[in-house]
């Protein structure tokens, strides 16, 4: 599973269940794979686990995450609450519930979370989760001082946990440019074989509107919305690591491949074969989705790093790039809990502003290298002129008009991001101005990227 070999993992778990149908953990592990692309099967296996062990809090919590992805807010809350009823110190359930619940002053859960945070033996990850949850509580109660107290502490601890260094990301991006420049020119004209769906890659900074645009495009009858896939970065990093070091598949997962690449190593990369392997690896992972539509979306925002590789390995691909007000984007990133090191820059304003400026510089590079091959769409323009911008977007994607794309909020597909419930609502305006009421707290960010349009 960790290698992206989902079909093989599914076979292993199904084999375990065939020999022990009352093995709750196997049902949960199988459901965790299906939750990425087949929620009906995920629901089935989580419910099976609960029927086997009804007092299994982790199963109720996991069921809640699937229900949340399906937009079933009330049912999701009930599952999280059941998990907390069974285990009141279940911090992940507290945090998950906080993201979808609107708090009032005397909610007993608030006291529970504050008491948990006082414990001296609390794991670092639990401290982070509780600080972000209590920040959300403070935001709901409009207590700005406590909001920033908990938010700043949560981000500070998260940076400590991830041991993140912005220099590592900046060096990695520099190496991406060099690898691409060295390998450019050897790409095949087309790697798309008969029966393969054509990709639309939706990229940009997190919290810039990528989930909204995927929801719009995937509402079209010819499009399958695959969500945030890590297949591309896995494929690229695996092949870079293999070309340079010749090591097996497991090694690249434990290394910062992009940072470790040296200029002399880059020259080892054989362009044509390199891009063909990226394509083949990507579609091998994608095969577990059993996509019947002709087109699919991949909306991993940070794929903006690899646009040159995408257009070389997938010449038929469309690239949709979301642009949003820089302060609105970075503020929204800062107030959300990102657990992976890939978003480690989110944890303080200095790193966040440096990363944003790096992103902007890299996008300028891709635009110059691939003129007229990257479609920029403004989040603000989309919210102000929904139909006009949707028509332009579909036209770029070579899709005919479909009224369902205007009624994207009725789309029942799974959404696994923090924007999951927002994209099930009608288009609304003004979210890019929400940061202004916290302006006094955001001066370090504003001074660095306020003019980075």
PLM ranges: what are they?
Residues 95, 202-204, 215, 295-301, ...:
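Short beta-strand segments
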Residues 190-239, 245-312, 322:
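Phosphate-binding active sites in nucleotide-utilizing proteins
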Residues 98, 110-121, 125, 131-199, ...:
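PAPS-dependent sulfotransferases, especially Golgi type II membrane carbohydrate sulfotransferases
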């Amino acid at each position: 599973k960790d290698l992206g070999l989902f079909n093989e993992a599914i076979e292993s778990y199904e084999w375990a269940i065939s020999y022990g149908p009352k093995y709750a953990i196997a049902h949960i592990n199988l459901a965790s794979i299906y939750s990425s692309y087949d929620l009906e099967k995920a629901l089935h296996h989580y419910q099976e686990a609960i029927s086997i062990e009804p007092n299994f809090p982790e199963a109720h919590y996991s069921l809640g995450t699937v229900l949340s992805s399906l937009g079933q807010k009330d049912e999701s809350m009930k599952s999280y609450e059941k998990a907390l009823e069974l285990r009141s110190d279940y911090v992940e359930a507290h945090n998950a519930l906080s993201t979808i619940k609107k708090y009032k002053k005397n909610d007993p859960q608030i006291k529970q979370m504050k008491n948990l945070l006082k414990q001296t033996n609390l794991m670092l990850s639990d401290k982070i989760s509780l600080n972000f949850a209590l920040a959300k509580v403070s935001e709901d109660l409009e207590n700005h001082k406590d909001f920033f107290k908990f938010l700043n502490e949560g981000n500070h601890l998260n940076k400590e946990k991830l041991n993140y260094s912005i220099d590592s990301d900046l060096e990695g991006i520099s190496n991406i440019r060099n690898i691409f420049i060295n390998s450019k020119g050897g790409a095949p004209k087309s790697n798309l074989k008969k029966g393969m769906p054509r990709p639309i890659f939706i990229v940009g900074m997190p919290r810039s509107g990528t989930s909204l645009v995927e929801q719009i495009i995937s509402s079209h009858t010819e499009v399958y919305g695959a969500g945030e896939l890590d297949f591309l970065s896995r494929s690229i990093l695996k092949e870079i690591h293999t070309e340079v070091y010749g090591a097996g598949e497991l090694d690249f997962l434990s290394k910062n491949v992009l940072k470790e690449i040296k200029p002399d190593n880059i020259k080892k990369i054989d362009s044509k074969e390199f891009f063909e392997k990226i394509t083949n690896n990507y579609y091998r992972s994608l095969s577990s989705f059993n996509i019947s539509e002709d087109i699919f979306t991949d909306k991993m925002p940070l794929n903006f790093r690899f646009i040159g590789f995408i257009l070389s390995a997938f010449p038929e691909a469309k690239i949709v790039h979301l642009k949003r007000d820089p302060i609105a984007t970075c503020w929204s990133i800062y107030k959300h809990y990102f657990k992976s090191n890939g978003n480690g820059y989110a944890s303080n304003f200095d790193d966040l502003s440096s990363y944003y400026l790096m992103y902007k510089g890299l996008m300028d590079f891709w635009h110059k290298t691939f003129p007229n091959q990257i479609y920029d769409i403004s989040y603000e323009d989309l919210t102000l002129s929904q139909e006009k911008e949707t028509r332009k977007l579909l036209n770029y994607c070579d899709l005919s008009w479909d009224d369902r794309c205007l009624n994207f909020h009725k789309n029942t597909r799974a959404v696994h991001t923090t924007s999951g419930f927002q994209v099930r609502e009608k288009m609304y305006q003004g979210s890019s101005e929400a940061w202004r009421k916290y302006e006094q707290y955001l001066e370090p960010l504003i001074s660095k990227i306020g003019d980075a349009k």
